[in-house]
Every structure is written in structure tokens, then in C-alpha cells.
Amino acid sequence: MPSDRRPSQRRNRSKSRDYRGARSKVTRADTRNRDDTLALSMYQGPPSADQGNNMADAPRFGFWTSVSQCLQYLWARRHLGLLLLLFWTLVILFRPVNTAKLPILAEAAELEPPLGNMLDFFFPTACIIRDNQVVVACNNQPYLSESECLKSKCCSSTSGTIIKCYAPVRDKPTQVLRVFGLAAISILVLGFLPMCCCSMCWRRKRMNRMLKVLKKQKSKGKKPKGRKASEERALLSH
């Protein structure tokens, strides 16, 4: 009887050793497969001929495609309306205006304060008379006193001119500098805004791709228990 038990115990020990060895082989194979998948995801090697044809058939991501995608994203986020509103305000501000039809400073002061301030900014005036400038009497009264002239927001002249109180003259150098500065700032803003939008969209796409890769790796790492058991049985049978 004890002699019969000893070979059975030896057989059970040999079976347990074989089972442990097969299980260790399965775990090693799983770790190798995971390392291979990680290496393939990090570096897939140079593209083959079939991959090159597929890449040629696939849509190419260029500057205009990124711009169109950014515009679609902005339209979905309802930010494109604000950009269009800003663009049309700039167009209205920089449209050509006939200076002969503009009112004088006294009439502009009677307008609303925001519009009057805007006209003062884009069409500044000064009391300095430059060469070949026509002088107009203040309120059609050229012989007003200095106090009345200042009350009417006009310029008084103490030199030997015919008109002692005249309306302010257009300051063209200051106007050119202001318009040029505002145009330069608006061009810079409108130039960098699409670039910023494109960079934001590109970063978002890159983050989405990275998240997709991580999800795929996690899904590959989490294998079902039934599949592991079938692999262990197959190795034990061999």
C-alpha cells in the first residue's frame, strides 16, 4: 500500500511542476506580446509600398485643411460670429470717407459722446496753420473776442491775420500716424488669431490620438479570463 501511494504522489508532483512551468510560459508570452505591442505603437518602422499607396490615397493634412477644420470648430462653438462682427466693424472703420462732407468740430460736438470721441480720434484737429491750408472763421464770425472764441472751442490768432478767430485745422500727420498704428495692430491680431486657433485644434487632435492609443493599449492589456484559460489548456496539452 505505501509503495502504491509513492508513485501516485510522484505523478501529482510532476503534474504540478508541469502546470507551473506552463503557467510561467503563458505569463512570459503575455509580457512579450505586450512589449511587442508597445514597441509597435511607439515605432512602426518605415512605411511599405502598400502603406505608401494608402497614405497617398488618404487625405493630406495641410494648412488649408487645418484652417477649414478650425473654422468648423469655431462655427460649432459659435465663436465665428464674433470674428465676423469684429471683421465688419474694422471694415466700417477703415472704409474711405470723403473729408469734404464731414461736419466741423462744433457740429461733431453736438453728436453722441462715443461717436464724437471716435471722430476726434480718427480726424484730429489742431490750431497750427501749415502751408497751403485754408482757414475758416469760427461760426462765420471772424472778429470774436478771445474769451468768446475759446468758449466756442475755436482758435484765436494774435498775429496780424485777417481772421482773429478761426475753426481748428485738420491735423493730417497725427491722423496718418493714428490710422497706421491702428491698422498695424488690427493686422497683427487678425494674423495671429487663425494661427492660434489652428495650434489649439492641432493640439486637441494630438491629445485625442494619444488618448485613443492609451485606450487601445489598456483594452489589449485586459484580456478575458476565458481566453487566458484556453491558452493555458493549449500549452498544457502540448
Curated annotation (Swiss-Prot):
Residues 101-178 are extracellular. One of its GO terms (cellular component) is membrane. InterPro entries: FMR1-like. Residues 118-176 form the P-type domain. Keywords: Membrane, Transmembrane, Transmembrane helix. Residues 15-30, 228-238 have a biased composition (Basic and acidic residues). Residues 1-30, 214-238 are annotated as: Disordered. Residues 214-227 have a biased composition (Basic residues). Residues 1-79, 200-238 are cytoplasmic. The keyword Hydrolase does not apply. It is a multi-pass membrane protein. This is Fmr1 neighbor protein. It comes from Mus musculus (Mouse). The lineage of its organism: Eukaryota, Metazoa, Chordata, Craniata, Vertebrata.
